[in-house]
């Protein structure tokens, strides 16, 4: 039986939300939005996450065509169990302090101060004049957009959520997975950009880790019981 669109959508939506809330890129988006125009930060982060989700789903969609569906199913099931155990372990180790938020903030602070020192030599009036003379496309793809895009892209590359998305796309309907993933990324990133540091600091990394661990294990059990053909 072919994997359903709704099944792929709901699994991808739930997995991505729990993986991204409290993630390094979530904190980065919140902090960047405090220092730069929100619309540019949101556009850069969302574009990056959409591209990353599409790439991950494409890899997962191609995998069953290169390797036996039976093997991709078993690998995906194993990944769910491994990520579930790792997430639970990380959740139990958390002491309640938002260490990742502090780490991301320190990294961005150093980068921000460096850029600020370089920009002091330029006249604000000249910058505004140049900006007005640039076409809209070049204004949109500004250094701020590129910065938000690159920080998010490289922060997500090789991340647990990316690997899980590849595995999910190999075992579920890829269109459902990409739709659920993009919607979840949009919800999380918008919340981070609009809520800023005040929202980010309220997130319990311990609870997020434990919740995502339980969800990964649940997906692993469902995948194991359904078998390669997707029948429970």
From Swiss-Prot:
The chain crosses the membrane at residues 13-33, 40-60, 72-92, 135-155, 175-195, 207-227. Keywords: Membrane, Transmembrane, Transmembrane helix. Its main location: membrane. One of its GO terms (molecular function) is calcium ion transmembrane transporter activity. It is found in: Membrane. It is a multi-pass membrane protein. GO terms for cellular component: Golgi apparatus; membrane. One of its GO terms (biological process) is manganese ion transmembrane transport. Belongs to the GDT1 family. This is GDT1-like protein 5. The lineage of its organism: Eukaryota, Viridiplantae, Streptophyta, Embryophyta, Tracheophyta.
